């Protein structure tokens, strides 16, 4: 039996392998039903240690170079890039403001040093911090497995809580944000700042040309089975002049709330979540106009 070296997230495993290529990882995942990839381990290792998830084989993907790096030419981000790397990269800060703010709010420094972008997305939590920022930047997910490579829009990556479109032998390889125009912002509410996951979150992007909104994006998290964009809210903003945006933002916020499918749980009630969707959507949209994404 091997114990993974993930600090306080360590857990004993019977079958631990460490491939150096996506092709090798795909083969190792396909060989054993119940195999799971390991990147940062901040979710998987905790679930295993607590007995909440049984994993027949752990496939450590941290040595796969194809999953690393931020490409300053095409703006793509490797699925294995850690939150700390996102926070330190000037291209990400300049182009994807909402993503930087989400990464900054994802746990404390130890979590940020370990948690990866791909892991945060593939855990498929409705509250995944980086999901809504990637949604508002029209991101494409690059997936690779034994059958080759394919691309899906990031809003098609999740099929439900804890579930994705990835086949058992596939890895999320890179994220390719498709839009950098305008400003983006991220807002959330949590129980304990930088410790707990979001109770509700929202991200937005506005591209203003000649005093008029040309492109609008609004996405909500922890308010439905999966993170989602709100096309009705976006449509309420397009074509509106910046001096007339206040009522349009309020209308968009109401539409975002209407699109939510919140649940009651130990952290918050459905009614509270629905109300906060409107509040956070409005804050995120106004954050775009401020040119910053304050938490």
Can you annotate each of these PLM segments?
Residues 1-295:
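C-terminal structural segment of proteins
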